[in-house]
């Protein structure tokens, strides 16, 4: 896969389930997800496909510079509007009807619900900003949504795009072998994940909970649900405010609250 060239030719990936186009001046950063882990495997299987569009390839200056001074003055530089605009337009020509997402600290906070919604699009273009940001006109005329992965500043949108792609890819059929692994992840059902244990049975005098060694699958399921609720209640109580609890979950949560009142 060539990471530094835009490609508008027809591809052989007829079975691809989801397409990503990345607008970035640092496509090499994405080797972390194109060559490794479940995303790397999914690309090799043609389950997902990633194309890169580098604004530097759309510049009209010999230095291929992609930064410019902001009108009105102020600190820092902005990404040059024209190369970025052309990169996005070319990505749109490749992925017809794709949704365009700009990674920005001003965007809506990314969560599991948004990930599950965006998968329906099948074609996604991520715009990775740099410097102090991008021209507002690009956002107004080319961007459909702005996403943020948290209330902190990064040097660019590439890391945020990788986070989003990794999370989205997990829900594409065939990427994760065991569907149950995805369904039991934190946030999938609105709760944090339960504690996990593996061999050996004892580490530094700390034992694996006996219930997990019992072989009683119903009791194990109940224990895990209780621990999941307990984790969520103590670490992320905000998640419970928006979750419609099942009868069993309500009973277990009320028991936890009573115990902690003692």
UniProtKB/Swiss-Prot annotation:
Native organism: Buchnera aphidicola subsp. Schizaphis graminum (strain Sg)
Q: What is this protein called?
A: tRNA (guanine-N(1)-)-methyltransferase
Function description: Specifically methylates guanosine-37 in various tRNAs.
Can you tell which superkingdom this protein's organism belongs to? Bacteria
Keywords of the record = Cytoplasm, Methyltransferase, S-adenosyl-L-methionine, Transferase, tRNA processing
Localization terms from the record: Cytoplasm
Q: What is its main location?
A: cytoplasm
GO MF, one term, reads: tRNA (guanine(37)-N1)-methyltransferase activity
A Gene Ontology BP annotation from the UniProt entry: tRNA N1-guanine methylation
The organism's lineage? Bacteria, Pseudomonadati, Pseudomonadota, Gammaproteobacteria, Enterobacterales
Pfam families xref list: tRNA_m1G_MT
Which enzyme class?
transferase
Q: Which residues form a coiled coil?
A: none
């Amino acid at each position: 896969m060539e990471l530094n060239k835009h490609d508008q030719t027809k591809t052989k990936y007829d079975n691809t389930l989801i397409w990503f186009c990345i607008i970035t001046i640092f496509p090499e950063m994405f080797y972390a997800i194109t060559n490794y882990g479940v995303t790397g495997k999914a690309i090799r299987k043609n389950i997902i496909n990633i194309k890169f569009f580098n604004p530097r390839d759309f510049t009209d200056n010999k230095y291929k510079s992609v930064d410019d001074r902001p009108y009105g003055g102020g600190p820092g530089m902005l990404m040059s509007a024209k190369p970025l605009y052309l990169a996005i337009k070319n990505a749109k020509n490749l992925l017809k009807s794709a949704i365009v997402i700009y990674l920005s600290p001003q965007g809506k906070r990314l969560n599991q619900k948004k990930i599950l919604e965006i998968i329906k699009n099948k074609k996604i273009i991520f715009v990775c900003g740099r410097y102090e940001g991008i021209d507002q006109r690009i956002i107004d005329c080319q961007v459909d949504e702005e996403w943020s992965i948290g209330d902190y500043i990064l040097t660019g949108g590439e890391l945020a795009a990788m986070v989003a792609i990794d999370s989205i890819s997990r829900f594409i059929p065939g990427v994760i072998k065991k569907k149950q692994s995805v369904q039991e992840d934190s946030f999938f059902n609105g709760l944090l994940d339960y504690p996990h244990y593996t061999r050996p049975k004892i580490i530094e005098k700390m034992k694996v909970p006996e219930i997990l060694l019992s072989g009683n699958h119903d009791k194990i399921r109940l224990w895990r649900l209780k621990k999941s609720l307990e984790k969520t209640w103590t670490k992320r109580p905000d998640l419970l405010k928006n979750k419609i609890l099942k009868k069993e979950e309500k009973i277990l949560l009320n028991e936890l609250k009573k115990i902690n009142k003692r």
